[in-house]
């Protein structure tokens, strides 16, 4: 009788345990599907807008001093949902290899366009190395911050290179969080990743968008001589606004020095920087920043609209019009930049390969035409 009672009591427990195990497995499966699938931003569909709609927009574009209300998003800053096989493939592999991309962490509006291939089919992705947590707290950036982030993943350089080789990308941008907690700021980790990528595909263009390493020139030299093609470091904003926009450890003149020294360590490098507009800067300050970058030997510059990622970040002071961005593109070309990418949705890594390759091909064609000797009649 006792044996029968014991069996009667244990049976429901076994059934309950199996049911709980099955439910846990189903829950884990759902979580995995959600992680790999589209997120909320993927479903926020915005209509395509024509230039005529932009020109007819009469909404307020500048927030006056003392105003707290956020500006309404103008039509030229609305984008369509990211779709396509390339986009889905890259996103799925990012999840599998536990890699981070600044495209997602920084909520870039161009993710579908870059991952999908863009106008000329040049696929570009931007991978964020050294984790998803930064030691700095810039007031414009949505990346997580902490004084001491988790340790580096020693397998990341190989995992990153393996993923990139399987994607068949033409151009890859490696960026990273700041790691002031590490003696070398993570410079050796970044350099190793570049070497692993080039070992698998020597033809791929590699751009590194790197921190300032608090002005440590040994770290700058490590990156400059790692085998990369483009050394990028963003100045972000004009000199006057730098203390309010960037982390207190970032300095305007320090950024210029990093860019100057990178070129000195490796004269064959292309150097690049980026400026956000809409934070309250004046035209004169933008002009001076562009000139400072040229004096530092910077070859390429991008200008884009600052967009407030959350309510905790800096508010947008002004939405700059596409016409104004066009002006700065023309001005950048006049100042002698190899290329200037300027537009409301342009980001430092926006279609980097497409802009870069197109510009290089155009310049080569111009040089070829200029050196051709006319045939005798």
Curated annotation (Swiss-Prot):
Binding site for [4Fe-4S] cluster 2: 134, 138, 141
Catalytic activity: [[Fe-S] cluster scaffold protein carrying a second [4Fe-4S](2+) cluster] + N(6)-octanoyl-L-lysyl-[protein] + 2 oxidized [2Fe-2S]-[ferredoxin] + 2 S-adenosyl-L-methionine + 4 H(+) = [[Fe-S] cluster scaffold protein] + N(6)-[(R)-dihydrolipoyl]-L-lysyl-[protein] + 4 Fe(3+) + 2 hydrogen sulfide + 2 5'-deoxyadenosine + 2 L-methionine + 2 reduced [2Fe-2S]-[ferredoxin]
Cofactor note: Binds 2 [4Fe-4S] clusters per subunit. One cluster is coordinated with 3 cysteines and an exchangeable S-adenosyl-L-methionine.
Disulfide-bond pairs as recorded: none
Compartments where found: Mitochondrion
InterPro entries per UniProt: Aldolase_TIM, Elp3/MiaA/NifB-like_rSAM, LIAS_N, Lipoyl_synth, rSAM
Primary location: mitochondrion
Coiled-coil zones: none
Domain of life the protein comes from: Eukaryota
Keywords, comma-separated and alphabetical: 4Fe-4S, Iron, Iron-sulfur, Metal-binding, Mitochondrion, S-adenosyl-L-methionine, Transferase
Gene Ontology CC terms, in alphabetical order: mitochondrion
Binding site for [4Fe-4S] cluster 1: 103, 108, 114, 349
Pathway(s) the chain acts in: Protein modification; protein lipoylation via endogenous pathway; protein N(6)-(lipoyl)lysine from octanoyl-[acyl-carrier-protein]: step 2/2
EC number of this enzyme: 2.8.1.8
Cofactors that this protein relies on: [4Fe-4S] cluster
Note in the entry: This protein may be expected to contain an N-terminal transit peptide but none has been predicted.
Family from the record: Belongs to the radical SAM superfamily. Lipoyl synthase family.
Name of this protein: Lipoyl synthase, mitochondrial
Lineage: Eukaryota, Metazoa, Ecdysozoa, Arthropoda, Hexapoda
